[in-house]
């Protein structure tokens, strides 16, 4: 007997080797499964000729785990099911036969089962119920759903437990849901889910928006839900349970509403199932699973206040970290939109895991920590070993060359170079959880955008900057959210800024000594030593958007720390280029910029140093710009060496000037000598905020030094006669420079630049590139800044020269007063009405003195260069010179019917002085006939286009004050042919360039003003040059100004010139002489 059994045992061993190969089932035409051809069990059984005698039934049934009758769900047919475990006969599988007889006979005769389902291909097994069957056991594969109905619940549980165990064993290395969610949606065959439903996603809501319609497997795990398409191993939709706002069912439909933090965005998913019982079961299962989230320490129960997704789900924690600055003072670090890494609370599996603070970006910690869904990940190591050398240090700066950028106002930009999609925190009022009594209810939510600035709202903390409440932040990625208190790590804080004031460099904390290698937080300027080390700043000061020439030019200012190591390192300037490398050998930086007045160079005050319009070059630092009280003076700008508009090259003095153009020049006096005055730093600059008051310039206009740096709004023409009497230099050292070399350079020297409408006001005295000129070689450039002040200055001092621009006049006679006040830098519109000498009074009584076209006298002007027009007006109603100042005049248009009234005022000498309002009482548009023959420029410019031109200023500019508007009278009629409808090309005239060219010797037209000439007469003329004459000048009149180089070539770019004459058309006395 033994000899017979031995060969049988050897044969069984060889067949067992073939049976170990897993069978590969495939459906046939009828939908049933059959064995595929190959070296499998089916091939052995299909060769009965070579089949040895069958073993006993006990030997064939040793791998059967469970067997019995069950009904099929679809048709209710009863079948005999056999559950086999993995053995030498084959892998774990579920088979069913027509009946038990066929099963037993098949073991002897080799009868095939009706169907074989390998368990390693199954997703999971679940217990279900529907309208027909209350006890269902369902198996799910990637392409099929198979369910069996049991007779009772005990039988259902028995099959469910047996199938679950075999499915777990058949997978080999069992994958839990946490490992699955680490791969973020990647499914492996045999993955076990808590529940799986086969649903039909309807094209409604997210199904239509995300193209998710069709048959899917809805796989539910303990923390997430997946939508897996048939015959696919990868979940196309991965949703966290905490992102689900609500769920429900309606008849045979089940729907899920997710929030905006989900991977699909906010919306609803509608799924159709077999019947309403299945939908109800799905609803109940989802609710039970979501309630079970509170078992996990990183989640908290959802409340009604959080169901609308206005507040993020916070972590349950009672840990408080005292002594930390809130993120409102340090800014929120920006990170990539796709970054989904967040830590679990301290009660998690690994004690090294911790919260992620709101001030940490990607690249904060070097340790791995598990995400909400259990994913293990490593962050960047940009800040490795930060602060370890500082035992008791309070703050740590970002290391140099670590890819960091920063904003000057403690607004960090990014903590890693690859951050291309910053986030911004938008806070809204909301309600937090009542279970957290130590923290303020937080309602901030993070909404990312590739273009936002990444700034944080500070309403999370209350009014105190030292509030110790921490900040809750929620990312827009599904698995990255948290309640984030600041955390001390290695006894220090990362990237927090000290808000304490240090006025002296030696009063810094000791921890700052170890921070010398770290980078400054504010924009400090150094010499341009290495262009490769510069980084482009997002908050760099930019010029006008349309200025093509200026955008090509940059400025580099020398940091004060390069000159003196005792200076504070945070002395900062804003320039076009970004931060350069700082000198590490100098005093270290405390990172704080005090906003209080302090001593010179002893504070971190931010001086708004102007930038240049010249080519990039290294320049010396301008002298001290702050007085003893700590206020920074708006120092006068000196233009860069640009090409002279009149053909001459720039002088040497211009080359040596500080090229700081571009910032608003608020300086007073002649700035030419500020470079050449060796005692300039020793001069007192004791100005205070008093001089920023509106009428405080009156005390400054009588001084002759350039120490007072407020702009007096006096006539630019007053300085004209100083060129002959006092010289062009107003500095104390008395050095004289040639007028033609210094003052002939007007702002029209940038005619070749296509200056358009920038975003800020620039009032440079020389080299200005923002002020248009009427007399360009090309078309007039658009004005750029809405100037809105009109200066009307009165002076009662007697003039030593008459005010006529006659042929034998000299440049020195082009003044308006004898007080020799310095001219401001590029005044706006100045109407200067002075008292004439008795000689002039006798010659012309109770009439307007001639007000000439002083905007054309660029050669003779010492300080201004015809940046804006001026109107020096001399009054003739004075019988004796006195010292009474009348500081206001009334400019009234079209008062021809009103006789002049004499407003006599007694001086201390008994002399009556008529009020200027009685003198300047009737103004009308006159004729631009001729100019002074004594003035000629080297290169006469071509005549501009004759015709009105109204140029609108920037719509974002300030609105004009009501006192700055000239109201047009209703009696004004249209007369001049040059006032056409072309003046309507701009709806509002903030800058009015009006050029009148009526017919010569036309006395009737010049006395009338066109109603349609410009809307500026109704809405306010902001920049206008009024050249007033006291009579109709005929070409043969001796007092008339003859054309020499053209009536427009003398103006180097002032605004429009309008001749005003008396409405009674009085002619100039021919007897007036110099």
Swiss-Prot record:
GO CC terms, sorted: cytoplasm; cytosol; intracellular membrane-bounded organelle; nucleus; plasma membrane
Single GO MF descriptor: SH2 domain binding
Biased composition (Polar residues): 347-361, 475-504
Composition bias, Low complexity: 426-435, 442-454, 804-817
Post-translational modification: Phosphorylated by INSR.
Function, in words: Potentiates insulin signaling.
Name of the molecule in the record: Insulin receptor substrate 2-A
């Amino acid at each position: 007997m033994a000899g017979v059994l031995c060969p049988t045992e050897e044969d069984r061993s060889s067949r067992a080797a073939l049976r170990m190969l897993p069978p590969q089932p495939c459906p046939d035409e009828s939908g049933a499964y059959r064995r595929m051809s190959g070296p499998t069990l089916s091939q052995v059984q299909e060769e009965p000729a070579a089949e040895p005698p069958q073993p006993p039934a006990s030997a064939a049934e040793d791998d059967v785990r469970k067997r019995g009758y069950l009904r099929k769900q679809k048709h209710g047919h009863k079948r005999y099911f056999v559950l086999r475990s993995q053995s030498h006969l084959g892998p774990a599988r579920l088979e069913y036969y027509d009946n038990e007889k066929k099963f037993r006979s098949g073991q002897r005769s080799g009868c095939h089962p009706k169907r074989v389902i390998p368990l390693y291909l199954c997703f999971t097994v679940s217990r279900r119920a529907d309208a027909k069957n209350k006890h269902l056991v369902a198996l799910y594969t990637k392409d099929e759903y198979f369910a069996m109905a049991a007779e009772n619940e005990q039988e259902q549980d028995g099959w469910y437990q047996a199938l679950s165990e075999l499915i777990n064993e058949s997978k080999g290395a069992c994958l839990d849901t946490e490992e699955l969610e680490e791969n973020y949606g990647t499914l492996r065959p045999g993955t076990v889910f808590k529940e799986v439903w086969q649903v039909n996603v309807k094209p409604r809501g997210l199904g239509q928006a995300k193209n998710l319609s069709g048959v899917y497997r809805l796989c539910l795990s303990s923390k997430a839900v997946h939508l897996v398409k048939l015959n696919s191993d990868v979940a196309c939709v991965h949703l966290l349970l905490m992102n689900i706002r609500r769920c429900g069912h309606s008849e045979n439909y089940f729907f899920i509403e997710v929030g905006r933090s989900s991977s699909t965005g906010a919306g609803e998913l509608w799924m159709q199932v077999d019947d309403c019982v299945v939908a109800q079961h799905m609803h109940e299962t989802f609710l039970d699973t979501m309630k079970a989230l509170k078992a996990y320490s990183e989640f908290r129960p959802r409340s009604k206040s959080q169901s609308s997704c206005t507040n993020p789900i916070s972590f349950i924690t009672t840990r408080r970290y005292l002594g930390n600055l809130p993120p409102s003072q340090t800014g929120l670090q920006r990170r990539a939109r796709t970054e989904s890494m967040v830590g679990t609370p301290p009660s998690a599996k690994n004690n090294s895991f911790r919260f992620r603070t709101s001030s940490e970006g990607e690249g904060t910690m070097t340790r791995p920590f598990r995400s909400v869904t259990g994913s293990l990940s490593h962050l960047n190591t940009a800040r490795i070993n930060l602060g370890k050398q500082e035992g008791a240090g309070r703050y740590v700066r970002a290391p140099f060359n670590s890819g960091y950028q920063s904003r000057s106002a403690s607004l960090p930009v990014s903590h890693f170079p690859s951050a291309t999609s910053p986030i911004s925190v938008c806070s809204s009022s909301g309600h937090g959880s009542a279970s957290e009594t130590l923290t303020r209810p937080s309602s901030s939510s993070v909404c990312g955008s590739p273009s936002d600035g990444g700034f944080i709202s500070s309403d999370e903390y209350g009014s105190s900057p030292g509030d110790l409440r921490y900040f809750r932040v929620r990312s827009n990625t599904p698995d990255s959210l948290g309640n984030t208190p600041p955390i001390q790590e290695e006894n220090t804080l990362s990237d927090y800024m000290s808000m304490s004031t240090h006025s002296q460099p030696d009063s810094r904390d000791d921890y700052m000594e170890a921070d010398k290698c770290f980078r400054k937080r504010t924009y400090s300027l150094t010499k341009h030593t290495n262009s490769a080390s510069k980084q482009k700043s997002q908050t760099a000061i930019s010029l006008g958007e349309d200025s093509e020439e200026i955008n090509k030019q940059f400025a580099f200012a020398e940091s004060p720390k390069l000159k003196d190591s005792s200076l504070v390192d945070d002395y900062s300037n804003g320039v076009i280029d970004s931060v350069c490398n700082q000198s590490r050998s100098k005093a270290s930086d405390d990172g704080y910029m005090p906003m209080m007045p302090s001593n010179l160079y002893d504070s971190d005050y931010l001086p708004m140093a102007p930038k240049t319009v010249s080519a990039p070059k290294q320049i010396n630092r301008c002298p001290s710009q702050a007085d003893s009280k700590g206020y920074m003076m708006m120092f006068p700008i000196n233009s860069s060496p640009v090409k002279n508009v009149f053909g001459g090259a720039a002088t040497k003095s211009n080359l040596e000037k500080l090229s700081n153009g571009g910032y608003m020049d608020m300086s007073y006096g002649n700035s030419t000598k500020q470079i050449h005055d060796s005692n300039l730093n020793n001069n007192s600059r004791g100005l205070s905020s008093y001089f920023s008051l509106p009428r405080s310039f009156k005390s400054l206009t009588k001084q002759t030094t350039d120490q007072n740096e407020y702009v007096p709004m006096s006539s630019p023409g007053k300085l004209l006669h100083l060129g002959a009497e006092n010289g062009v230099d107003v500095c104390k050292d008395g050095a004289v420079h040639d007028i033609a070399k210094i003052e002939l350079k007007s702002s029209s020297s940038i005619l070749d630049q296509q200056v358009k409408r920038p975003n800020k006001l620039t009032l440079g005295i020389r080299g200005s590139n923002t002020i248009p000129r009427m007399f360009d070689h090309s078309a007039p450039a658009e004005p750029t800044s809405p100037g809105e002040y009109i200066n009307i200055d009165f002076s009662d001092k007697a003039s030593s020269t008459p005010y006529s621009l006659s042929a034998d006049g000299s440049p020195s006679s082009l003044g308006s007063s004898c007080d020799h006040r310095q001219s401001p830098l590029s005044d706006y519109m100045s109407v200067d009405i002075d008292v004439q000498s008795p000689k002039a009074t006798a010659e012309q009584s109770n009439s307007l003195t001639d007000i000439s076209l002083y905007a054309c006298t660029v050669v003779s002007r010492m300080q201004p260069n015809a940046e804006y027009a001026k109107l020096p007006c001399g009054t003739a109603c004075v019988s004796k010179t006195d010292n009474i100042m009348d500081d206001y005049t009334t400019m009234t248009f079209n008062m021809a019917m009103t006789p002049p009234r004499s407003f006599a005022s007694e001086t201390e000498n008994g002399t009556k002085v008529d009020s200027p309002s009685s003198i300047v009482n009737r103004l009308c548009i006159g004729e631009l006939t001729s100019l002074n023959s004594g003035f000629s420029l080297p290169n006469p410019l071509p005549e501009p286009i004759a015709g009105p031109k109204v140029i609108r200023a920037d719509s974002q500019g300030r609105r004009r004050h009501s006192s700055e508007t000239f109201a047009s009278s209703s009696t004004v009629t249209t007369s001049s042919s040059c006032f056409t409808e072309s003046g309507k090309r701009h709806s509002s005239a903030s800058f009015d360039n009006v050029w009148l060219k009526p017919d010569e010797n036309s006395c009737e037209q010049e006395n009338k003003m066109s109603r349609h000439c410009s809307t500026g007469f109704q809405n306010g003329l902001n920049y206008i040059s009024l050249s007033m004459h006291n009579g109709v000048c005929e070409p043969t009149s001796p007092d008339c100004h003859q054309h020499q180089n053209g009536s427009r070539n003398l103006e180097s770019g002032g605004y429009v010139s309008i001749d005003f004459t008396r409405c009674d058309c009085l002619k100039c006395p021919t007897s007036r002489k110099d």
